[in-house]
Amino acid sequence: MKSVKVFAPATIGNIGPGFDVLGLAVDGLGDFVEAREIPGHKLVIEDIFNADHDISTNPDKNTAAIAANEILRMFNIRKGIGLIITKGLPSGSGLGGSASSAAAGAVAINELCNGGLSNDQLIQAAMKGEAYVSGGYFADNIAPSILGGATLTQSINPLKVLKLGSIDELIIILITPKIQILTKDSRDVLPKNISRSAFIENMANTASITAAFCNNDYSLLKDNLRDLAIEPYRSKFIPGFDKVKIAALDSGADGMAISGSGPTVFAITNSKKKAKIIEREMVHEFNNHGIECNMLITVPSKSGTRIIKAN
């Protein structure tokens, strides 16, 4: 029987000031979903590997399976399908773990059904999966995970997503403190209103970062990686955030921000030598607050969700 294995990359939601709008796929991290035809007419989750906590095997409560079933609905097909999910991303890390699983699930079933769906349809199906855990429809993680590179979500309904490109010089230092922040909780803390000055600066910074990825311009990114609207509220969930940011900048980083809803934070540089120093100092500061971390020095992933193996 036919089978396919798919990889979907991790993502940085918001890229600083671009709340719910900007997102970036990163290399070296992500989730795998293997889908295979089985007897019967239902989709089932056969196994889940490397999960850091209990992830439901109920297809109605699993992001990959929800996205997969949505693809089947789009094709108007009922068939037996078994899913095997291998997690490469911790839950509640701010690296788009639920989005990655949903993206992989959507693309895997599209391939199993001989393809034909557009990127927009794949994004819509994956958003339905992620909505189960995030509480709403957002594409700032889903879109870059499927498309690769940086993306801009203009609207959700109707769906309008632009692929912006990448920045060749960009080196990303990802630090994930070993604490969990749920997306729903991090949204509840956000203010209903922000100051005019914060709004204006975030608009300018978001526009500049958009231009940076469109023009492969590292200097434009580093000069505008500042978030005055959301970071002051979400950073309260991350112990030692302010000191970690100071440590990053003092050790040569050109900017630091929260990845998505956190707790992962990311710093940027265009120097491999500096990247190792920045990583060391950020981890050291988290350790000073009694927090262990996972860390990775990486680059943007120009490729999005992709087929690893097909039989």
Predicted regions located by residue number:
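Short, hydrophobic/aliphatic alpha-helical segments
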Residues: M1-G13, K79-G88, A126-G135, P239-G252
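ATP-binding N-lobe of GHMP and related small-molecule kinases
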Residues: M1-S93, E111-L117, G148, S301-S303, ...
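Catalytic-loop motifs flanking and including active-site residues across diverse enzymes
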Residues: D60-T63, G97, S101-A102, N205
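Short Gly/Ser/Thr- and Asp/Glu-enriched loop/turn motifs at secondary-structure junctions
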Residues: G80, A139, I258-P263
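Short beta-strand
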Residues: G255-S259, I297
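Short hydrophobic/aromatic beta-strand micro-patches
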Residues: F266-N270
